[in-house]
């Protein structure tokens, strides 16, 4: 489909069982690999998007970094990181294409609000 418009998928998950997953309140999602995503969205002509870490991926970055490397320019990551993440790790994620950090207060083990505020300031 070519409409002359640039399409950006603002929120999608890659669930690749080659990488660590953590059951979230007893739920582990079914596989949805990057190949599955591409097959499902190829007819739409999507040219970029935001790969979002789910709570079931905890603080593991390996799947996200692999996905961003495979997707290339135009794609960004949204991740979850512990509130004690070193500045060097935050910078490394930024270099790899991570552009946002999400704080999953209920299911993601994000920590308390004061520590999250400090982390948010370091990320920004």
Give, region by region, the residue ranges found by the protein language model.
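An N-terminally biased module of ancient metal coordination in phosphate/nucleic-acid-related enzymes
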Residues: 1-59, 63
């Amino acid at each position: 489909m070519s409409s002359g418009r640039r399409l950006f998928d603002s929120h999608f998950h890659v669930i690749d069982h080659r990488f660590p997953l953590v059951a979230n309140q007893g739920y582990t999602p079914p596989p949805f690999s990057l190949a599955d995503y591409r097959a499902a969205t190829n007819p739409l002509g999507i040219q970029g998007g935001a790969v979002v870490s789910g709570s079931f991926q905890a603080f593991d970055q390996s799947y996200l970094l692999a996905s961003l490397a495979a997707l290339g320019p135009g794609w960004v990551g949204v991740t979850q990181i512990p509130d004690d993440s070193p500045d060097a790790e935050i910078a490394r994620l930024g270099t790899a294409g991570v552009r946002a950090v999400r704080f999953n207060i209920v299911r993601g083990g994000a920590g308390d609000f004061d520590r999250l505020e400090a982390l948010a300031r370091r990320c920004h």
